[in-house]
């Protein structure tokens, strides 16, 4: 029997650059996540984790940064020995401009992890850049988040990293509000505004398409049943063709007025259907809910 193949994403970088958002995104994609793990505990952590699920593929994401101790220089060395555990390890380094980091700290009023050294914020940022420079140099990818908001960063992580460490076709089902614009990166866009709107039901207005009451409402609507059936037939046919054409990933977007009920429901239902059909690399992204 072929041994299970495991994937490890190491998220590092500068404080305030979006590492926590990235780690949470991987968690939402069913990665087993741990933040602020001391570097010296990494081998033990992985051995324990792999022992728990010995016969299944494991997808693990860990956050390691300046808070993780003084042994950051050992991280890249350990990454290259990960194949001993049949692990594909990927090191991602997140950063942002000094101006962006200063603004983010001003907005959140959080303390920098190195502030206990008696440094000003610009000095702490400069020192952190110096201490993490070896990790940046060794990283598989360096992500500058200066121009990203939270939604853009989450989507970038999903499309560029979380779904691309596989030779299989990766599927992203996205919901959005037309009033905020159509996602320019979508391969297929479906307009759900023609469907009955749960927003006009007072007891459903505050809920989303993820909630069971909204699902029950949608599944009682004949037009919704027909809409889903026809889109399912279309995608079942053409996604298989796209995989045969060696596409890496496909984004399918559903839009409605507010991006809260109909589009979310449809994206969730299509993602569930895709998993049931055997697609292993499937994710959802709800732009207006993030």
Swiss-Prot record:
GTP binds at residues 65-68. It comes from Xylella fastidiosa (strain 9a5c). One of its GO terms (molecular function) is GTP binding. Keywords: ATP-binding, GTP-binding, Nucleotide-binding. This is Nucleotide-binding protein XF_1405. SUPFAM superfamilies: P-loop containing nucleoside triphosphate hydrolases (SSF52540). Displays ATPase and GTPase activities. ATP binds at residues 13-20. It holds the Pfam family RapZ-like_N.
